[in-house]
């Protein structure tokens, strides 16, 4: 029995001192070190002692890091992977290394990196990712790296960086972002402002320069001239008609998204109806209301007609088209959105009392209300409903404008006799 006990302890001791054959393992300066550098390795070898705190795999031929690559060494504090052939770091390759303080991935070919793995590395103090093929860094990539002191992103292929990328790095003292092909458009202006104001050391600032546009090529970011830039704004309203559109019989709903911003924002319609969600990211019809060539629609006249001028037309509006219609605008400086809930109602649901002589709809961000004369009035808590008469497409048989026969008020939708369309306006 005693011999079995000794054998068990011997086995445990042997496991504790195990080391992959190509590597050297030992203790130095109080650290358990595994040195696998310059071993011509093409994969991370298995069999490391679980108590390893420093691992060098530099100067090998590793092509990538798969999920769980370092699961055997959860106590790692330093990991050196420079000068390999790494192109991809898979999700889960680094996520288990919650004690990691130093990570060197420099001088590789990384273009595909699992940025979400960094969210678990809250102890990280040094991150070297220079001399790779990175083209994009998510805005929240460094959100958990509150202990990070040094970040090296120089010599990559970064064209821009999202505003706020470095905000979580409250301990940062050293940043290298030189020698990237930055596009000096509105989206990069924040970086110039931040770099000039921050206490973080940013060396080689003359090499943080523009690659495009051509007129600014070679200009250091610190000397970037003022650019005409503004974040998007949107205003969602209704239109009485759509000039030039060939409308089929039925009810017609017309919405218009007025977009402003510099550079010109991209417009996107998000429609939530009973049957699901419809996304429209570009115009799908011409001015005649017919589908543009190449538009993936089932017929020559789409159910939801998105025009290049920001208008959206639903030629056959009914119960199946009830829902939330959202207009989104995005450019390099951000995004803006405005929404409207649309439902059919019959007369007698409060229409006459609410309509009165004028009708209202909440403007974007509560800035005011639009009346039949398109005047802006102060918005109040009661201004959350617009009641609009509907009539069949075509010439109306009767007018509804403030009792004046034959005249329609500006802004009224012609959508179906004796029906009411309720707009519950919201904006975000």
UniProtKB/Swiss-Prot annotation:
Main location: secreted
Any Pfam family matching the protein: LRR_8
Domain LRRCT: 180-231
Compartments, record wording: Secreted
Transcription as UniProt keyword: no
UniProt keyword annotations, A-Z: Disulfide bond, Glycoprotein, Immunoglobulin domain, Leucine-rich repeat, Repeat, Secreted, Signal
UniProt cross-references to PANTHER family, sorted A to Z: IG(IMMUNOGLOBULIN) AND LRR(LEUCINE RICH REPEAT) DOMAINS, IMMUNOGLOBULIN SUPERFAMILY CONTAINING LEUCINE-RICH REPEAT PROTEIN
SUPFAM superfamilies in alphabetical order: Immunoglobulin (SSF48726), L domain-like (SSF52058)
Signal peptide (UniProt feature, chain positions): 1-18
Disulfide bonds: 257-327
SMART domains attached to this UniProt entry: IGc2, LRR_TYP, LRRCT
Signal listed as a keyword: yes
Domain Ig-like, chain residue ranges per copy: 232-343
Cellular component, GO, one term: extracellular region
Stretches forming LRR repeats: 51-72, 75-96, 99-122, 123-144, 147-168
Chain ranges of the LRRNT domain: 19-50
Name of the protein: Immunoglobulin superfamily containing leucine-rich repeat protein
Glycosylation sites: 51, 309
InterPro entries in UniProt: Cys-rich_flank_reg_C, Ig-like_dom, Ig-like_dom_sf, Ig-like_fold, Ig_sub2, Leu-rich_rpt, Leu-rich_rpt_typical-subtyp, LRR_dom_sf
